[in-house]
Amino acid sequence: GHYTGLMYFGREAYGKKNIPVFAMPKMKSFLTNNGPWNQLIDLKNIAIKNIQHDSTMILNQQLKVTPFLVPHRDEFSETVGYKIEGTKKTSLFIPDIDKWKTWNKSIIEEVKKVDYAFLDATFLDQHEIKRAMSEVPHPFIQETIALFKNESLATKNKVIFIHFNHTNPALQKNSKQRKEIEKLGFRFANEGDNFEL
């Protein structure tokens, strides 16, 4: 559902021109063949740039980005994470994924390879909303913490939680849950944060 924000580039809102939109093949097809998204392309509000699984894009002399597929609902498009490489540091960006165990890679090993790991923290635990959590699959923060339980403080400190549902109590900076998680060595992204790459 995150693609819905593209509508704000159209003539009803910003009326932008040629905003680059990096899209995997299935997402490109969806945007090209469905309204109102195809109108954004026809009116040149957005310009689709093709990306491929595990194919590195060099954005400039200081920044490389590699998209990779992750398992998620995928009703309308692929779901991807990104490895982002700067001149000094590297980050992992996975805002959406079903569960860590459904991915064909070890999240622990992938985190160890980077300086920062921005990870899906949609829900704190399975009791957060009053419906079947299988309808909105995401790794609970508590599951991620359990996976990293025996890892070093340095490894835990690379994990920066992002992508919170409004029901997640850890979204609140002064919540008991957030403070307990931070004591374990994990971090939370905040609006205005900057991370050197």
What is each stretch, according to the model?
Residues A13-K17, W37-A47:
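A short alpha->loop->secondary-structure connector
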Residues K88-T90, I97-D193:
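Cap/insert and terminal regions of metallo-dependent hydrolase folds
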